[in-house]
Curated annotation (Swiss-Prot):
Single GO biological process annotation from the record: maturation of SSU-rRNA from tricistronic rRNA transcript (SSU-rRNA, 5.8S rRNA, LSU-rRNA)
Compositionally biased intervals (Basic residues): 18-30
Subunit structure: Component of the ribosomal small subunit (SSU) processome composed of at least 40 protein subunits and snoRNA U3.
Name of the protein this chain belongs to: U3 small nucleolar RNA-associated protein 25
Family assignment from sequence similarity: Belongs to the UTP25 family.
Pfam families: Utp25_C, UTP25_NTPase-like
A single GO molecular function term of this UniProt record: U3 snoRNA binding
Organism: Paracoccidioides brasiliensis (strain Pb03)
One GO cellular component term noted in the UniProt record for this chain: small-subunit processome
Keywords for the protein's UniProt record, in alphabetical order: Nucleus, Ribonucleoprotein, Ribosome biogenesis, rRNA processing
Upper lineage: Eukaryota, Fungi, Dikarya, Ascomycota, Pezizomycotina
Region (Disordered): 1-173
Regions of compositional bias (Basic and acidic residues) in chain numbering: 38-47, 113-127
Amino acid sequence: MAAGRGRGGSTPFNVRGGRGRGQKGGRGSRRPTFEASRVAEAHHEGSSEDGSVHSGSDLDAEDQLEAPDESSPSSSDDEEDENKTEKPYNTLLQLFNAGQDAGGPARKRRKMDHNSKKVDVEVKGSDESDAEGLLLESEGEESSEGEEMEDMEDMPMDEVRTENSGDENDASDPFEIHFSNVDSTLLSQKIEAISSKGWQSHKSELPGKLRLMASQPNTEGHTIQVLPATQGVDNLKLKQKLANHAGDHISKFDSLASSLVPYMFGYQDLLFGARTLSNSAMFRDLYCLHALNHILKTRDRVLKNNSRLQKEPESDLELRDQGFTRPKVLIILPTRQACVRVMESISKLYQPEQQENKARFHETFSAADDKLWEHKPDDFRELFGGNDDDMFRLGLKFTRKTIKYFSQFYNSDIILASPLGLRMVMDKEDGKKQDFDFLSSIEIAIVDQADALLMQNWEHTEYVFAHLNLQPKESHGCDFSRVRNWYLDDQAKYVRQTLTFSSFITPEINALFSSRMQNTAGKIKATPTYEGAILDIPLPVPVKQTFSRFNSSSPVKDPENRFKYFTSTVLSSLIRSSTGRGGTPRASGTLIFIPSYLDFVRIRNYLATSSQTEHLSFGAISEYTSVRDVARARTHFFSGRHSVLLYTERTHHFRRYHIRGVKRIIMYGVPENPVFWGEVVGFLGLDPAGTAEAAEGGVRAMFSKWDALKMERIVGTKRLGNMLTEKGGDTFSFV
């Protein structure tokens, strides 16, 4: 059986969404710092080996990229609020001055021989069984015993030049344009336009009946340009190491990918609302390739500049090529098995000679599919197949020939995590130790399967984005003379690229697009044109599908207006159909589908206490109902003992039950996932003998104008307009 399915509730009291397997490594172990005028790290009593690092050229090239790990940096809420009122540059000066008196002996360097064969290396962390491991950055920190298998400083300089041949700086490279060759005046103009919501937009069509909306900051003299399609990886500005491998795994792009790749690799924000089982692997490979390309270009830029500073130690070179901390890419995923798929893409594109702790990664992250799920839908098996635990985090560190799993966050290049996994380490339970500085220098944020995250606890995702690219509270060994100016000016969130992939778009995802995706390079949104889920009903006979519109003046008042319409209009009809003469109960087989758990609780309590429903027998199944109570409710409903069954959308998402005995369906609101419409309506045909009767009972769904996004997926793009604005009536039927 796979690990327990995470079900982080949508209600505030449910913080956890699954079982965490965080493991403790060496919390006191020291981390090397940037080379040159770096801020010294305060000495920790529990530091490994000798404590600090070598200075100057004694640093190996990989260490020059790394910021030290503070074992338990913390700040009170009052301090956090106070910091928000200070100017960013003054804050950085205080951090810089605070670390000047720190020091310690140099760390011993360890050189190890290596061969050219691809091997997996296991490096065990200390105290892995300690429960505090849940609160550590990665699920098990790398040990100082597993020092680098390769030191670039041990390579002759001509070998370094050979490795980087063909990778010289290209002024037309989007990496150079977006991060290095930044016009500070133009950047400020774009940020000012974004802050005042001054976007200019252009709409166009994409292959596959998709609609594209491209937006750019509205600055004088700049207009939106529709980028030409890219046919294959040969047309991308890739590091040579990646180009060689990418061509073997990603040949030519299909028409959809060709249209979107220029924006992705051009560092524009992307909200893609048409993720499917057929295109998910392709887009996963593409965003992994983009992330690796960014990591390698950032790393090589720092190494080349380090070499320049070593050759000209007395020069006044100003080489700004870094952020505050090392992590540059954040990938947010719903489950551990999704993390395994991403790592498979990264490994095949990077082709490392060594992978440290790979076996341990597969042991703790991967699992076999449950054989009992063979009858489940394909999208269910993709999401919940294997290890479906939604409490995880993983740091990845890249060297020239190695991928190191379970590296500490401040020592990592890429962080892969679930929203809950990050929330647990960012916001400690004791409330005294908060640490999110490792998110201060994220330059690419990727959210895959955003629709699945909605069914966990979307508030965790919002919390993570609210803490991206904030000014750090600690120096973490940062060399401020190498930090890019837009970091120092607190403008990093306007340079960060965000890529979001979802099967459909909801108001919550739209809010993320509007408020958190503020890239000065621009942003695009790709959405499908829907035919409508009402056309794809798995029944042999036509089913009457009725939609009832109620008036709602605002989203805030919508829950109250919906409940009032249900109790005054829908419920009276329900009671008449489910009771006989004299108020005696009569089995009606009515299923009430409820998208929101809060609405479910309200309706359940009303049916249990209202005099209007005193003769109405009902059962209830929610995502929090025990297996035993679920079985009892289903049995009573099928036998007719309960004439009504309440059933939530999140229950269906996590379980995909087949409810028998359904003769009529009332939808308190249409589902977010259009696939659920056909599956729930399909309950009417589970008993072949009563299919005709059930089809006549049909479906009645309630909606308001605030359900426009959901309704578009259910009834189709063309039908939606009239249903929202029709003056002649508020009931619409389809057969």
